[in-house]
Amino acid sequence: MSAYQNEIKAVAALKEKNGSSWSAINPEYAARMRIQNRFKTGLDIAKYTAAIMRKDMAEYDADSSVYTQSLGCWHGFIGQQKLISIKKHLKTTNKRYLYLSGWMVAALRSDFGPLPDQSMHEKTAVSGLIEELYTFLRQADARELDLLFTGLDAARAAGDKAKEAELLAQIDNFETHVVPIIADIDAGFGNAEATYLLAKKMIEAGACCIQIENQVSDEKQCGHQDGKVTVPHIDFLAKINAVRYAFLELGVDDGVIVARTDSLGAGLTKQIAVTNEPGDLGDLYNSFLDCEEISESELGNGDVVIKREGKLLRPKRLASNLFQFRKGTGEDRCVLDCITSLQNGADLLWIETEKPHVGQIKAMVDRIREVIPNAKLVYNNSPSFNWTLNFRQQVFDAFVAEGKDVSAYDRNKLMSVEYDDTELAKVADEKIRTFQRDGSAHAGIFHHLITLPTYHTAALSTDNLAKGYFADEGMLAYVKGVQRQELRQGIACVKHQNMAGSDIGDNHKEYFAGEAALKASGKDNTMNQFH
């Protein structure tokens, strides 16, 4: 007996147990509603998706070609449409995740309006967006199953046993739109207790994976901006522990923690690390400080000094009371950060880089893997990179190293459209196309994400529509550029009433009121023009 039929049988038994007062209840309708609402709580989702992510991590360890991917989504509808599209084109959601970007929460979801990525937005906007994303994905499940149920009723009415069997199999083997989410908690929005409290909210909303960074919470900057300030390892590890305790308290034992290091581009620290003996973690952190050796007689009022190897060292302190690291130490600090995080509870790493360069990432990962052989990265394929210019310059430099003639190119102007059809541009585009595959094969990247692609796609599509609609094209701009494309490409949203749940509501009306139901999907519904 199929899972669907088992649900019907279970509800039928309940109906019989409750006698005549349940005479209006149709067991098959109730079974359908149960199947459409597979995940009852966010914790159900977090546990289910954590198991998926752990399985994917193990599969990547065995075969680096099976990496995972995601796109950042700033609204539940965007996440829903992404997963509907993935199922339509690729037939499965396997290895495809959601990403929640703190940058987009700040820019698009705050009651204060657009904000920079500096943790100034309401922290509950983060957990709120996670809940919203999964609400929309659960609705996508309900909608797709509703279409299957409607088809099943039609097959039965037509006496088509083969079609009925086919649809029953599709119902039993239905793949949910619910997938893992990697959710950005920034630097934790405060101390370790604040981190724990927000992590709980995020997990309760459905997050199986939380990404946390080693910046100072109240000095936090976007990873691609200047002025980043890191914290000593002991402070960061306390927040990793806080997230782990939140997972364990809520029973999400497989919860995943991504430890992000911003040290490559961070030249400052807010404080000198506590150290108890030479070579301990605090001492290693302090060893990267930009210091000058002084004598006791040179000590000034309020000076901060450290003693290393019998020498008095005065760290360079800025007017902001921040301390400066030595230039050129970023990669060494990143490697230390990553090894330390993995040895103290993190599952995955995130190294924020200033450019997309497989060789640069690989060099750091190779050093990390000397200590932790299965170290894996989540990597930000960031829109903050000029991908075209970066890769054209990489190819230009490779051509020079190979002794090729590059006299036809100006390295500083390679973004120009005049180079689009050149050999250099074609080689660069191919390297962009294979960047994720190459990064996973050679640089330990388990998960590739784009942080804020849907921010840019929303702006681009709106610009294209406005450009024509408010000018000479008028309504043709919408019809030609949007609706006609939706119809021809099979975009489900062209039937927007159905996408918003109108047909589900109509079926519920029939469940609840029988033949007396007043439905919205009759012959006068304009959505019938799109069949």
From Swiss-Prot:
The active site is at 222 (proton acceptor). GO terms for molecular function: isocitrate lyase activity; metal ion binding. It comes from the Bacteria. Its EC number is 4.1.3.1. InterPro entries: ICL/PEPM (IPR039556), Isocitrate_lyase (IPR006254), Pyrv/PenolPyrv_kinase-like_dom (IPR015813), Pyrv_kinase-like_dom_sf (IPR040442). Its cofactor is Mg(2+). Pathway: Carbohydrate metabolism; glyoxylate cycle; (S)-malate from isocitrate: step 1/2. It catalyses: D-threo-isocitrate = glyoxylate + succinate. Substrate binds at residues 101-103, 223-224, 380-384, 451. Gene3D superfamilies: Phosphoenolpyruvate-binding domains. GO terms for biological process: glyoxylate cycle; negative regulation of single-species biofilm formation on inanimate substrate; tricarboxylic acid cycle. Keywords: Glyoxylate bypass, Lyase, Magnesium, Metal-binding, Tricarboxylic acid cycle. Mg(2+) binds at residue 184. Involved in the metabolic adaptation in response to environmental changes. Catalyzes the reversible formation of succinate and glyoxylate from isocitrate, a key step of the glyoxylate cycle, which operates as an anaplerotic route for replenishing the tricarboxylic acid cycle during growth on fatty acid substrates. Belongs to the isocitrate lyase/PEP mutase superfamily. Isocitrate lyase family. Homotetramer. This is Isocitrate lyase. It comes from Pseudomonas aeruginosa (strain ATCC 15692 / DSM 22644 / CIP 104116 / JCM 14847 / LMG 12228 / 1C / PRS 101 / PAO1).
